[in-house]
Design a protein with these regions (language model features):
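Extracellular recognition modules
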Residues: 105-107, 218-222
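Short glycine/proline/serine/threonine-rich loop/turn segments at secondary-structure transition edges
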Residues: 54-57, 97-101, 203-216
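Accessory beta-strand-rich segments of carbohydrate-active enzymes
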Residues: 34-143, 167-169, 293-301, 305
Length: 307
């Protein structure tokens, strides 16, 4: 299944290793080469439809998590390759697809040269651990955004720096900061130059973010091609300061005693595949135990978990 780990679906055996690699005791380390024996291969194929309404748009394929690597073909043509078990791989497949039925094929290996960089204390599985999605976006869209909130030295007022990167067809970008009730706190419209632009908001006495008062704002980013809005992206924003002064951890100027835990992206049934319900259960149990800080293992966890 997708998502699903091979070893939990009848293909191969799960391996737990603290220090070392999954082939420890059977094969010698020879980076960047990995053993051929027991390096299982998974092949995936399925058809999908591209609606006519997607004509003229950029079409992206996103694979949320593929262990240990993934080769991608669409309609018999090679699209690309990625290796990083805990980061999403995104491919622009616009020129590979056609309206109507299309064929996608993936090939994955249990181990790759990237496996040498993923030697951490956890269960070793292979497969697709997160969702696979197709997205159609207007030619005028947001490429990247960097948001930097900073409190002043008195932990009272704040600035919010927003830096955007866009495709060439974008003529303007509208920025709107809203409070928890949806009210407009600040807004600005900028014209990117060379696909880049930025602005710094001055925010007077914002509600602060902390573990006890998780106040969040929402930044709306509306992209326009000069004829109308082509894309709107929202991002939660929290205003806080984290620092160490005189060997004391301070959040918004106040001392905090960390009661933390390490959270691996690991499910007793799904392995690396962790459902939203299980994530919420984890959070509920941690709150019951008065845990106020979480280390999200050695890897990037799925985005929806901290959200």
């Amino acid at each position: 299944p997708v998502p699903g780990m091979w070893e939990l679906n009848g293909y191969g055996d799960p391996v737990y290793v603290n220090i070392g690699y999954a082939w420890r005791g059977n094969f010698r380390n020879d980076p960047p080469y990995v053993p051929d024996a027991e390096n299982h291969v998974g092949s995936y194929r399925r058809t999908f439809d591209i609606p006519a309404s997607w004509g003229g748009k950029d079409i992206f394929l996103s694979i949320g998590s593929a262990t240990s690597n993934v080769y991608v073909w669409v309609n018999g043509r090679f699209v690309g390759y990625s290796e990083d078990s805990k980061l999403a791989a995104q491919f622009d497949i616009t020129k590979f697809v056609k309206p109507g039925e299309n064929l996608i094929a993936l090939q994955m290996f249990r181990w790759s040269d990237g496996t040498y960089l993923e030697d951490q204390d956890f269960w070793r599985f292979a497969g697709i651990a997160r969702g696979v999605e197709l997205t159609a976006r207007d030619k005028a869209h947001l490429e990247d955004v960097r948001i930097t909130p900073v409190l002043d030295s008195e932990y009272k007022d704040a600035t919010l720096r927003v830096e955007v990167e866009t495709t060439p067809r974008v003529k303007s970008v509208g920025l709107t900061l809203r409070d928890a009730a949806g009210g407009v706190v600040a807004e600005h419209r900028l014209q990117p130059a060379g696909g880049k632009g930025g602005y710094v908001f001055e925010v007077a006495d914002p509600a602060k973010w902390s573990a006890e008062t998780p106040n969040l704002y929402t930044l709306e980013i509306a992209v326009s091609d000069g004829r109308g809005v082509t894309e709107t992206v929202t991002q939660p924003v929290g205003f806080r300061s984290v620092e160490i002064r005189d060997a004391q951890l301070l959040v918004n100027g106040q001392p905090v005693l960390i009661k933390g835990a390490d959270r691996h992206e690991m499910d007793p049934v799904g392995g690396y595949v962790v459902s939203r319900e299980r994530m919420i259960e984890d959070i509920r149990i941690m709150k019951e135990m008065n845990i106020n800080a979480v280390r999200s293992e050695e890897h990037t966890s799925e985005l929806q978990s901290p959200q």
